[in-house]
């Protein structure tokens, strides 16, 4: 087994803010500021990855901005723009039995409770009311669907999720 810990993407470095090396952050966490709960951060741009220390942060007009140790001017900060923000997978909290991280659902096959293969989860969307599975249909889909949007409503639509089998069973009409 590798001694490298598995990394997950928490967000992305947006633009430079000001002239003193501050950076705008695009957080992929539910609450924007929750990205600050996970450390250490590694910034990955292309094939280069570096661990960084956040020395300060602020919220500015609903945008999170951070100060990285050793980055003290606009030019140094510009070199980090576009970097993915990574942390160790082990930093994520354990979830209850019926909760899953989106990253665990993406790539799973989706089948109906009658055995019809609807396709593979390619993305997730947050709608406010509930999350939605974006399912890319199989090439030979009998209903000529290319993509399906299936609400992630546990026990109403989602009957079961098997991490081991990488499969989600749904109560869903394949023609819809």
Curated annotation (Swiss-Prot):
Alphabetic keyword roster: Chaperone, Cytoplasm, Ribosome biogenesis, rRNA processing
Any GO BP: ribosomal small subunit biogenesis
Location of the PRC barrel domain: 97-176
InterPro entries per the UniProt record, alphabetical: PRC-brl_dom, PRC_barrel-like_sf, RimM, RimM_N, RimM_N_sf, Transl_B-barrel_sf
GO cellular component annotations of the record: cytoplasm; ribosome
Signal peptide interval: none
One matching Pfam family: PRC
Location of the protein in the cell: Cytoplasm
GO molecular function: ribosome binding
Highest taxon of source: Bacteria
Family: Belongs to the RimM family.
Assembly, per entry: Binds ribosomal protein uS19.
Record remark on domains: The PRC barrel domain binds ribosomal protein uS19.
Function in brief: An accessory protein needed during the final step in the assembly of 30S ribosomal subunit, possibly for assembly of the head region. Essential for efficient processing of 16S rRNA. May be needed both before and after RbfA during the maturation of 16S rRNA. It has affinity for free ribosomal 30S subunits but not for 70S ribosomes.
Name recorded for this polypeptide: Ribosome maturation factor RimM
């Amino acid at each position: 087994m590798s001694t490298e810990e598995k990394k997950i993407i928490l967000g992305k470095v947006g633009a430079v803010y000001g002239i003193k090396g501050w950076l705008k952050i695009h957080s992929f966490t539910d609450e924007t500021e929750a990205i600050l709960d996970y450390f250490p951060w590694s910034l990955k741009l292309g094939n280069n990855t570096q661990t960084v220390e956040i020395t300060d942060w602020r919220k500015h007009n609903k945008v999170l901005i951070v100060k990285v140790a050793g980055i003290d001017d606009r030019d140094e900060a510009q070199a980090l723009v576009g970097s993915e923000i990574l942390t160790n997978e082990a930093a994520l909290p354990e979830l209850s039995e019926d909760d899953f991280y989106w990253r665990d659902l993406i790539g799973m096959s989706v089948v109906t409770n009658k055995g019809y293969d609807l396709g593979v989860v390619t993305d997730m969307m947050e709608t406010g009311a509930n999350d939605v599975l974006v399912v890319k249909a199989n090439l030979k889909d009998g209903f000529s669907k290319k993509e399906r949007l299936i609400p992630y409503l546990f026990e109403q639509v989602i009957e079961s999720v098997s991490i081991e089998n990488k499969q989600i069973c749904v109560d869903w009409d394949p023609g819809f």
